[in-house]
Amino acid sequence: MAAAPPLSKAEYLKRYLSGTDAGLEGGPESGRKRRKKRPKPGGAGGKGMRIVDDDVGWAAISTDKLEKEEEEDGDLPVVAEFVDERPEEVKQMEAFRSSTKWKLLGGYSEDGHFHNDDQDPSPPRKARHDTPDASPPRRVRHGTPEPSPPRRVRHDTPDPSPPRRVRHDSPDPSPTRRGHDSPDPSPTRRVHHDSPDPSPPRRVRHDTPDPSPPRRVRHDTPDPSPPRRVRHDSDASPPRRSHRNSSAVSPKRGHHGSSGTSSPRQAHNHSPAAAQHRRTLDSSGAQHHRRARHDSPDLELPKAKSSKAAERPSSKTVSQSGLGPPHPSLSMNSKYEHDSDLSPPRKRQAKAHFGAKKQLDSKGVCQKASDSDLSPPRKNSKSGHQDSDSDLSPPRNRPRRQSSDSDLSPPRRRQRTKSSDSDLSPSRRSPRSGKKTPHMYSGAKTGLVADVQREHQELKKQDQDATDLGAQFEFTETVFRDKSGRKRNLKLERLEQRRKAEKDSERDELYAQWGKGLAQSRQQQQNVEDAMKEMQKPLARYIDDEDLDRMLREQEREGDPMANFIKKNKAKENKNKKVRPRYNGPAPPPNRFNIWPGYRWDGVDRSNGFEQKRFARLASKKAVEELAYKWSVEDM
């Protein structure tokens, strides 16, 4: 089949634009029939059902809306509008007051006026759990403006911003305590409902101005009011957790003396320390220094304190000292009113001291102001304040503690009341009077010349005694003692050892003779004697040799007619001698050990023939060896 001719671009474009009619009119494809496409099942034909599971997240919706709004705003014409140049706080307050989303308890009176008893410049805290607010806390950044509607707010503060849960580890230059008369630029936290409230009585905080009697105040604020109970150290740390209701661990504290974003922190519920940590220095600025707690922002250690056990001495101190009127809610909140910190001491900020080293309180007790003490205040019943710059208030009934600069040690026992500026050394024992006299660096005593001479004489005498003692025992003989402690005589021991060795050698020789055999030893000795005797004779033996003739005569020969005569003569000779009887019968068969039979043997062999077989085997073996030797040497 021939290939179709190629089409030009113009022709192809013409057919494409004209649709199917152009294809039918001309070209080789015009005669072909096109197949109808079948509609796919489940398509747009209306048959079946399609389920689309597409969950759109809130983040995507919010971003899409923002983008669309921006695009629409770009298309709209530019129109002059009213610009509200008021501060952000005022705008938020207006929006908060005009909003109906929030129901305030005790914040507004019936006439609609907002009771702002406490302008709080402090950063937000977490609300106590005894407040009737069930809204959840939000975790936000304190540096970004919050456009969301206000959340849980203090009932006595004009801040409509939402509460935040704050972090414990970012340094914060903003004030962290509640000021009494400075506007609040920082976002609010969950707060205590301690403003005038028609609701039932609650545990109130001691840092809000209320009609109760005055409490301790800060020692560096020119405050003519009666004393209030405050912390005497600029606390840069978040409130600690008590065993009961607060267990917040704050690894870092921010410095809260400069304006800026508020310090992130998470104040725990019912924290008694939060009530006393949040007080400002003066009443004019929005951000002022707090008096530092005896801890630095970075060296804070985790601590857990028992509010119940730690606050009872505080209430006792207030009632006994009588320097300030008692708080009406003292009986109810005595366990929350004072921060008796049992945590390890920390460095104190030198923020609120302003160079004051020593100051006298109303009773004239002088106490050193420790500029960089890191330890928390200890309970002390003595009056005396460490750091009061311009304190015009009456004397406070505040526990005095022993301040120690750069003190990182664990809390001391409360019996110690003396303050030491920078004494980190262990306690010294005072020299006992009358026991030791002072000495100079050379070691000599101080005093009269006669005493010095007497000392020299004593030293010389001691040296002489030591020399004499050394000379006395220089050439002495060493004394050896046994285990019982008695002296040992080495010479006598050597003699005893020698005698014992000789006796042992004799016994060994006797056992050696017995082991070799006495008969063999006697026979060997006899052979030696005979050999010596023969050596003394001439070289050749003759017939006239008496010894040779006797030996030949005593021999017994088989078949000798004179054998019986010889035996009888020997028997007669040996009759008078006491000799054991011996077998004298015919020659017995040989055995392995050459044992002679007893004198009563009758000559009958009653053995099993083992001895005879043994000797026959030995004889045959020897014969074979001789035959082999002869065969090996026969051709030589």
Curated annotation (Swiss-Prot):
Region annotation Disordered: where it falls in the sequence: 18-55, 64-83, 106-469, 554-597
Ranges in coiled-coil conformation: 448-537
Per UniProt, subcellular location reads as: Nucleus
**Which sequence positions carry the modification called Phosphothreonine?**
T131, T144, T157, T208, T221
A Pfam family this chain is assigned to:
Bud13
Q: Does the keyword Phosphoprotein apply?
A: yes
Look up the domain of life of the source.
Answer: Eukaryota
Query: Which ranges are annotated Basic and acidic residues under compositional bias?
Result: 294-314, 452-464
Residue ranges annotated as compositionally biased, kind Basic residues, are 345-356, 429-438
Alphabetical UniProt keywords: Coiled coil, Isopeptide bond, mRNA processing, mRNA splicing, Nucleus, Phosphoprotein, Spliceosome, Ubl conjugation
| Phosphotyrosine modifications at | Y511
Q: Where is this cross-link: Glycyl lysine isopeptide (Lys-Gly) (interchain with G-Cter in SUMO2)?
A: K65
Q: Report whether Coiled coil shows up as a keyword of the record.
A: yes
PANTHER family per record: BUD13 HOMOLOG
Sequence similarity: Belongs to the CWC26 family.
Query: What's the subunit arrangement here?
Result: Part of the activated spliceosome B/catalytic step 1 spliceosome, one of the forms of the spliceosome which has a well-formed active site but still cannot catalyze the branching reaction and is composed of at least 52 proteins, the U2, U5 and U6 snRNAs and the pre-mRNA. Component of the minor spliceosome, which splices U12-type introns.
Described purpose of this protein according to its UniProt entry: Involved in pre-mRNA splicing as component of the activated spliceosome. As a component of the minor spliceosome, involved in the splicing of U12-type introns in pre-mRNAs.
What's the protein name?
BUD13 homolog
Give the source species: Rattus norvegicus
